[in-house]
Amino acid sequence: MQKSLLAVLVAAGIGTTASAQKPTATAPKSYSAAGKQVQVYTTADNSQLRLSATDKLSFKEVGQPLETQPTVFVDPTHTFQTLVGIGAALTDASAETFAKLPKAQQQEFLQAYFSPSQGIGYTLGRTNINSCDFSSDTYTYVQDGDKELKTFSLKHDEKYKMPFIKQATAAAGGKLTLYVSPWSPPAWMKDTKNMLQGGKLLPEFRQSWADYYVKFIKAYEKAGIPVWGLTVQNEPMAKQKWESCIFTAEEERDFVKGFLGPTLKKGGLSDKKLIGWDHNRDLAFQRAATLFDDPEASKYFWGLGYHWYETWTGSGMQFDNLRRVHETYPDKHLVFTEGCVENFKFDNVQDWKLGERYGNSMINDFNAGTVAWTDWNILLDETGGPNHVGNFCYAPVIGDTRSGKLIYTNAYYYIGHFSKFVRPGARRIATASSRDVLQTTAFLNPDGKVAVVVMNQTDKEQPFQLWLKGQAAQATSRPHSIMTMVVN
């Protein structure tokens, strides 16, 4: 990308859309689109359109829609879950790449992601406890064998990760909803004596490991980084070549019920949102049933986290499993905790399918009841790393440390069609499409604006009408495009 992203967004008029937010949107008893305008923002393949203000539409009163009229129906009087936020993981790899960029590009990056007016307004973050694959080395915060955690120190994180998180928080207006996840306990706490290649937490170290979470959260907060929540274990059913640890559903339930939950409570951290599973959609229902059907375990869990990598088995994305969880446990919250496109190749950073995978997932995940959506690495370098086991992947923004430039993939813009226009406190509202080529979701923001996202993954343009309570506005979805239609 040759031109500064900020200049592109301002030129498109996007810098004028931010407004003061109320805590939570309230469903209106009635709604009329009469007299309202629709500002359309578009990102489309084979064009220069990237979150560009493209059309301004008006509503007209219409009668019964016909089957021959492609229509996106929206009803703001029917509301569902409340959005916590949209964002990404601030990993060691992201922090190290950020530190290698020139100061001007660092500031561009921070505004591009975290400014709601000049960027795409991220409000959510995730970071790792101990090392993960997207670290340059394997590390923990204690010396080997220190069961009482007397040697606990954040010295490793103080070099890159913590300053990075603090700058991101400042760029987000001083508030970032941050949650934390471990990939593995220290090697000496495991049956394999290895942080990599799976293995299990030894029973005699369950209390020490529970204490470890509390130590980490309190140390981060003492250092000026508030922590909103935590997951129990990243990908607990995967034996990976990187940091990993296996927990069956019963083992996770019993660890939380007997150790982690009570330890958080004893440590004064009961307000932290505890999220179970943190793995793929395929086994999500079975995990939820095991964790939430036990009242002594369930009382500690705020929600269930999930990833999108179930496709490694040859399956498609299993969104219906999320619906089963939401239907069965409506008091628990669904959180998308990780997703990226793997097998990085620099020549493919502008592959349009990158963005479409995000758009497809986000629309379906939100429609299934998801309250928070977290991309994987927020920034990676020109190799798709750094990564200490060679597991390179794509990030929406690539920091080319050779040239010092930022490369914005179309995934950045696709995510921005949600994060920029659907703000924390927004309520998902009823929406339906009369054509399967038009995927859609919609939200009512705290400021009263309605944001409707419409995506077209086909090679053909699709005219349609946006229909709200007997009022319709005429629009066209371009081939391989995503639109956000802001009704005000």
Question: Where does each model-flagged region fall?
Answer:
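N-terminal catalytic cores of secreted or lumenal carbohydrate-active enzymes
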Residues: L51-V227, T248, G258
